Amino acid sequence: MIKSDNFNFYKDSLDYILRVQSLDGSISWEQNKKLDPWDHIEAAMGLIVGGKEHEARSAFIWLKENQEEDGSWFSEYINGMPASLRKESNFTAYIATGLWHNYLITKNKSLLKEMFSTLDSAMKFVISLQTSFGDINWAKEKNEILDDSLITGCSSIYKSLDCAISIYKILGYESKDLAESKGLLKACLLQNTERFDRGWKSKERYSMDWYYPVMCGVIKGNEAKERIQGRWHEFVIQGMGCKCVVEEPWVTIAESSELVVALVAIGEKDKAKELFDWLHQWKDPQDNLYWTGYVYSDQKYWPVEKPTWTAGAVLLAADSLFEFTSGSKLFLEEWEDMDRYEIK
């Protein structure tokens, strides 16, 4: 029996992403289903963990070829066509995290150079949505800014800004605007939390709002440990995984995998390994793929989906735990000031 610390344990997840990926490089949730840019990138990151450099590059080239003039992407595509006119800031920013992750693993700058103009346009779009308070509005639709911000989305953007700044430095470009944006965003996330969820019910009931500031490096050290410990009993079901929403009896594999990364980031590797081990029971024995989630009150998988982004999240969590690649510390380091990490 293959152990979970052996990469072959995850080969079916890698192969699944490859099967779903279209010839144009796009990676939808499932075969012939919708695509969103964030999850497309998450799946592409799973590909590069598995050493699929050509296929991962193809996924980034799809982004290059489908970028809007303002630097953004639409939030949803079906069969290559936009299915929504909304443009979400964290979806657009995530290209930076994906590209930096790719660089850490491939050890060359070719894709960074090829994609730099795409990245630059994307980051300009993102920081154009930043308010004077430091938060970044969550979306734009029909040229109108949707005036509210998300803790999870802004935490993800914070990590993407860190990765983008690192790319700019590696390639010799000025990144002062991005660094200022990152500093303002962090200050807002830490000190001005009333800027978030102003126009809707608080998202604190979602586990992502709990662990994302830790996973993405906004909150560190003892404060990060206290944050995770403080709501652990609310979100984590022993022997099962992490709930998506605090009041729902539903553990989800992607959120649980991200929580694994957050635990590794705060030095709780044994706890991360225990949590990760619980997740493998949620694979379909027919094809060895992970379901989206499990409703334990009904003892049913729901929804009846096996998304590529769940496969990608599992691959990233496995890498953070077992260090299969040189990208395993992607979420464990603050890269902006680490010139020593440049790979010649």
Regions found by a protein language model. Name each.
Residues 20, 28-29, 33-41, 45, ...:
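N-terminal beta1-alpha1-beta2 module of alpha/beta enzyme domains
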Residues 2-34, 57-87, 116, 121-148, ...:
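Extended glycan-interaction surfaces of carbohydrate-active proteins
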Residues 91:
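Extracytoplasmic catalytic/substrate-binding loops of multi-pass membrane glycan-assembly enzymes
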Residues 151-195:
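Active-site neighborhood of glycoside hydrolase catalytic domains
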Residues 1-3, 41-53, 94-111, 156-173, ...:
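Well-ordered alpha-helical scaffold segments within catalytic/enzyme domains
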Residues 54-55, 111-114, 118, 176-177, ...:
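Alpha-helical positions within canonical tetratricopeptide repeat
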Residues 28-31, 78, 109-113, 172-176:
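Short, surface-exposed loop/turn segments at secondary-structure junctions
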Residues 38, 94, 118-120:
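Short hydrophobic/aromatic segments of transmembrane alpha-helices and their interfaces
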